Amino acid sequence: MAKVRTKDVMEQFNLELISGEEGINRPITMSDLSRPGIEIAGYFTYYPRERVQLLGKTELSFFEQLPEEEKKQRMDSLCTDVTPAIILSRDMPIPQELIDASEKNGVPVLRSPLKTTRLSSRLTNFLESRLAPTTAIHGVLVDIYGVGVLITGKSGVGKSETALELVKRGHRLVADDCVEIRQEDQDTLVGNAPELIEHLLEIRGLGIINVMTLFGAGAVRSNKRITIVMNLELWEQGKQYDRLGLEEETMKIIDTEITKLTIPVRPGRNLAVIIEVAAMNFRLKRMGLNAAEQFTNKLADVIEDGEQEE
């Protein structure tokens, strides 16, 4: 998991630092935010102190109604030794009690002109993206008709050559050789290329080529959600391969199950066309049109009609 510090959030959203500068390198370990309304009312039993605290108009207007002594106690309790930051929205004025408590405990107090809900949404999206679980897989990621296809297989099976043919057919390369994958949601995997090899494709006998330079900016993209895995393997004579497409194999990446197709490789098979059609067929299945199921249903009807005639 990547490290995110308060300083990163401050720079990303151009937040104004009010006080507690010594704590700007505190780590942020979770994407969940806290709006400590009930804590300002005095209930700290389940206070999530390790989260970024977000104060809006509602919390601060209630805070202003508290007696002076309670104001100091509430802010001292909000500013703990593990609280990454306290952020105020709408350019609200900062209570002096909060400034004093933040300087005392080294908790950064930041301010944003954004509305509270808008700021909360943007912060959550940023933190979920940066704190998402990550892994790296040997393969090629291509955007085919809007479907993120991760092509895997043993070294030398023809992954990069297939990707090159797909790019020539108008599809977009995301990553070759090494695909960095992060799980942004419970069932969302997003892949991208390491910065060092972004837009590059390695073809044996030809060397390294820059896809964006050769084919233009429309032939590449920086990241893509992975929807299906296509595993290329050398054809084995005695092995049984799926010929109808009724059985759906899956592959687990991090904590997400992804549909996986195994495509046997042998001379004369146009892998680029097969993968292209597989991506289109996958989209049709998700739209409720399954050719294999339609065929088996028709076959069952024909068999049933034949039995009735007998």
UniProtKB/Swiss-Prot annotation:
The enzyme may harbor two different cation-binding sites, one that interacts specifically with the nucleotide, and the other that is involved in the binding of the protein substrate. GO terms for molecular function: ATP binding; magnesium ion binding; phosphorelay sensor kinase activity; protein serine/threonine kinase activity; protein serine/threonine/tyrosine kinase activity. Mg(2+) binds at residues 138, 160, 202. ATP binds at residues 153-160. It catalyses: [HPr protein]-L-serine + ATP = [HPr protein]-O-phospho-L-serine + ADP + H(+); [HPr protein]-O-phospho-L-serine + phosphate + H(+) = [HPr protein]-L-serine + diphosphate. Changing residue 158 to A: Loss of both kinase and phosphorylase activities. One of its GO terms (biological process) is regulation of carbohydrate metabolic process. Its cofactor is Mg(2+); Ca(2+). Changing residue 153 to A: Loss of both kinase and phosphorylase activities. It is an enzyme of class 2 (transferase). The active site is at 159, 177 (proton acceptor), 243. Its EC number is 2.7.11.-, 2.7.4.-. Is active as a kinase only at high ATP concentrations or at low ATP concentrations in the presence of the allosteric activator fructose 1,6-bisphosphate (FBP). The pyrophosphate-dependent HPr phosphorylation is not stimulated by FBP. Kinase activity is inhibited by inorganic phosphate (Pi). Dephosphorylation of HPr(Ser-P) by B.subtilis HPrK/P becomes prevalent when the concentration of Pi increases. Thus, the kinase activity may prevail under conditions of good nutrient supply, whereas the phosphorylase activity is dominant if carbon and energy sources become limiting. One of its GO terms (cellular component) is cytosol. Changing residue 155 to A/T: Nearly no effect on both kinase and phosphorylase activities. Residues 201-210 are annotated as: Important for the catalytic mechanism of both phosphorylation and dephosphorylation. Changing residue 138 to A: No effect on both kinase and phosphorylase activities. Induction: Constitutively expressed, with or without glucose in the growth medium. It comes from the Bacteria. Homohexamer. Belongs to the HPrK/P family. The Walker A ATP-binding motif also binds Pi and PPi. This is HPr kinase/phosphorylase. It comes from Bacillus subtilis (strain 168). The lineage of its organism: Bacteria, Bacillati, Bacillota, Bacilli, Bacillales.
